[in-house]
Design a protein with these regions (language model features):
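Soluble "head" domains of membrane/secretory-pathway proteins
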Residues: 2-20, 27, 60-234
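Hydrophobic membrane-insertion alpha-helices, especially the h-region
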Residues: 24-42
Length: 234
C-alpha cells in the first residue's frame, strides 16, 4: 500500500513538473507566435516589393508595411491588391500588385500632354522625379526615355479593349466599388490602363514605408502626400 501511494505521489510530481515546464518554457513562444499571426492576418503585415513598377518611390525587394484596417481609400495612397480577380490576363495566377490610387468611384481620369488629371484637376506627380529623374521622363533598366503614352481618358481606354475586365468596359468614370490605379514607373507598369478597374473587395491593405526608409519615399507613401494629391493653383 505504501509503495502504491509513493508511486502515485511520484507520478503526480512528474506530471506537475511537466506542466510547469510547459507553462514556463513552451507556452510563451506559442502565445507570441499566435499574437504575431493574429496581427498579420487581421491588422498589419509586410510585403517584399517585386519588380520596378513603383520605381522610384518603391525599390525592387524593398519591404513595405501593409495596414489591413484602413478601408478609407484616398487618391494618392499606395495599395496592395490581389491580381487574379482584376487582371484577366493573369490566367488565375495569384499575385499581389502594388500600385497607387489615382481615381475613386465617380472620378473621371485623363492624361493629356504629359499631365494627369482627375476631375479636370492636375495631379501632383513630383514623385516621378525622385532619385534624380526628370519628372517627364520614365526610367527603364538604367536608361531614360520620354513617356510616349498617347493622350487618353477612361472612355477611350475602356472602349473595345480586350484586356479590360468585364466591369471596366465602356466606362467614362470609375464605377462604384472600384478604383483606378497606376504604377509610378509608368512605362513598365501593368495597371488600370491595361486591365481596368480594381474591385475594392480585392484590396489587401494600404502600404507605407518603414521609419528607416528614405525621407521622400516616406512622404510619397503617407497621408501628407494624399492631402497634396493635386497641384496647387497659383
Amino acid at each position: 500500500m505504501q509503495d502504491n501511494n509513493l508511486n502515485q505521489r511520484e507520478e503526480k510530481g512528474f506530471f506537475s513538473s511537466l506542466l510547469k515546464s510547459f507553462l514556463k518554457v513552451i507556452l510563451p513562444p506559442i502565445l507570441i507566435v499566435g499574437v504575431i499571426l493574429t496581427i498579420r492576418i487581421n491588422w498589419f503585415d509586410y510585403l517584399n516589393v517585386s519588380g520596378s513598377s513603383m520605381y522610384p518611390t518603391l525599390q525592387d525587394h524593398q519591404l513595405v508595411l501593409v495596414n489591413k484596417t484602413n478601408k478609407n481609400y484616398k487618391r494618392g495612397q499606395v495599395i496592395s491588391f490581389h491580381s487574379s480577380p482584376n487582371n484577366t490576363s493573369s490566367n488565375g495566377a495569384e499575385k499581389l500588385y502594388i500600385k497607387r490610387i489615382i481615381g475613386l468611384p465617380g472620378d473621371s481620369v485623363s492624361y493629356k500632354d504629359g499631365k494627369l488629371y482627375v476631375n479636370g484637376k492636375e495631379v501632383n506627380q513630383k514623385f516621378l522625379s525622385l532619385r534624380g529623374n526628370d519628372e517627364k521622363m520614365e526610367s527603364t533598366e538604367g536608361t531614360q526615355k520620354p513617356s510616349t503614352s498617347p493622350n487618353w481618358d477612361l472612355q477611350s481606354l475602356s472602349e473595345g479593349n480586350p484586356g479590360f475586365n468585364s466591369w471596366s468596359q465602356n466606362q467614362a468614370t470609375v464605377p462604384e466599388g472600384t478604383l483606378f490605379v497606376m504604377g509610378d514607373h509608368r512605362s513598365v507598369s501593368l495597371d488600370s490602363r491595361y486591365f481596368g478597374f480594381v474591385k475594392m473587395e480585392t484590396v489587401l491593405g494600404v502600404n507605407s514605408s518603414f521609419p528607416w526608409d528614405d525621407k521622400e519615399q516616406k512622404y510619397y507613401t503617407s497621408d501628407d502626400f494624399t492631402n497634396n494629391f493635386f497641384v496647387k493653383e497659383k
